Swiss-Prot record:
Belongs to the closteroviridae minor capsid protein family. This is Minor capsid protein. Keywords: Capsid protein, Virion. The keyword rRNA-binding does not apply. It comes from Lettuce infectious yellows virus (isolate United States/92) (LIYV). Residues 219-236, 247-258 have a biased composition (Basic and acidic residues). Pfam families: Closter_coat. It is found in: Virion. GO terms for cellular component: viral capsid. Disulfide bonds: none annotated. Minor capsid protein that encapsidates the 5'-terminal portion of the viral genome.
Amino acid sequence: MLEAECDEVELTSRDVGDYLMFKTRITDNFTGDLTLNINTSNLIKFKTCSFFICYGDDKDRYELGWTSTSTSRSIFQHYKDGKYIRDFRIQDPFPILSGSTFPVVISKIIANRVAFRMSRRLNNVIVDKLKNNIIEFLFVVYLDVDTGKIKPNTILKNLDLSSLFIVFSNNGNNKINLPYEIELQTKDRGIVYTKMGNPISYNLFNKFEDLLDIETKGVDKPEDKPKPVFDDKGKQPTDTVPPVDNGKPDISKPGEKQGDIDIASKFNNIVMAKLKAQSSSDPLTKKQCDQLMLSLIKWFEKFGITKDNARLLIFQFGISFSTSKENLNNITNNIVVENDKGGFVKILKIDYLNKLYGSIPESHTHNLERVLLRHYAQEILILLRSKVLEWPRKLARNKGIFEQYAYMACDFFDTAELELTEAETTALTTVKSWTMNHYKKKRQIVNSSQLE
C-alpha cells in the first residue's frame, strides 16, 4: 500500500508516460441497443486522453471511440489475434467544441449483424456478430511525464466522472449499474496498481477519487506551508488546494497491465493541460434547463395557462416557428391558447424569447431556445408521434420529408442522439442522400461556360 507523505511526487524523465485507465464491463451478452454519451467539454481539459467502447474480447474485438493527442480523431478499428487489422480502420479528424456531447451507438440488428454509429462522424458500419458478445468501456487519461513535480491527485479531484459520460440502455429509460476496474500505471517505479470495484451506479459518486482511494508516496517531505490568509470578507483564496482524503487504504498489487491495449506506449513527452473553468458561453446543463423550464412555466401561469399547457406551448413555439436565429426578431409569430378561465390568450413568440433570455443572468452566444429544446428532444419526439403537438408540415415540405414523418423536421433535433425507429432512420437517410446528390450536381457547374 502507498503512504501519503506529501502532496507532490517527484518524477524522472522516461520514454513512456504515466496514465490512469478506467475500464468497465457494460454487458456480457449484448442483445439490444446501447448509447454512450460522452461529455467532451470535460475531456478537452486534458491534452491527451482516449475513450473507446469495445465490442468483443481481448482476442477479437471492434473498438469505436475518440482520441486526442495533437489533434482530435474519431476512430473505428478491428483488433484480432494480437494486432490491428490494417485494412479495417476508419479515422476522422474533427474539432471538439466546449459543451458538446459525443454519442456512441451500438445496435443489434437481424441476421447476427451489429451496427456501429458515432454522432455525425460514423454512420451505420455493419459487421458480423462476434463469438464473445461482450461490451466494455475504456477511458484513459495521460499524466505529466516531464521532469519535475506534479500533483497526482489534481486530475482525480477535478474530473467529475458522473458528468463525463452517461450510459443508457432500454431506449434511455434505465441507467446501468456496472462493475469497474481502475489501473494506475507508473513506469518509473515499474509497478502497475489496479483496483476492482463492485457494481455501482454512476450517479452515486462524483469524482474518480471516490473510487480510487489511491494515496501517493513522495520522495521528499515538503516543508510546512503557512495557512491561507482570509480576506476582509472572510472568503478563502481561490488558489488553495483542498486536502486529500486519505480514508480507506488502497487495495493495490503489482502485476502486468490488463488487456492488450497499450495506448500509453504510443506517446512520449505528454504534458497534462491546465484545467479551465466552464465559461459563461457554454451551453446549459440539464439542471440549468430544468430550472429555466420552471421559470418559463411560472411566466406562462400569469396568463392563466396551466403548467401542462405551458410546457407544451414552450415545445410548440420551437416546432412551429423553428429555432433559427433569423426568426428571433419576428414580431408576428404567435400562438393562441386557452386559459384556465375558458378564454383565449395570444402569446407572441418574441415576448416568450425575451423572457427566455432574460432568465439567464450570464451572457450566452449560443441559441438558448435550441439548447433548451434539445435537452427535452426525446420527450418532444414522443409527443409528436402521439400527435399531442402540431407537426411542422411546412418545414417538412421544404426539407422533402415524407408526410407521415413530417414531425422529424424539427430543426433542433439531433438525430444522432435520438432513439429512432428503423422507418424513421430510413426516411431521414433518403432525404439526406437526395440533398447531397442534388447539391453535388450544382457544385459540378462552376460557370455558364461549362455548358457549352
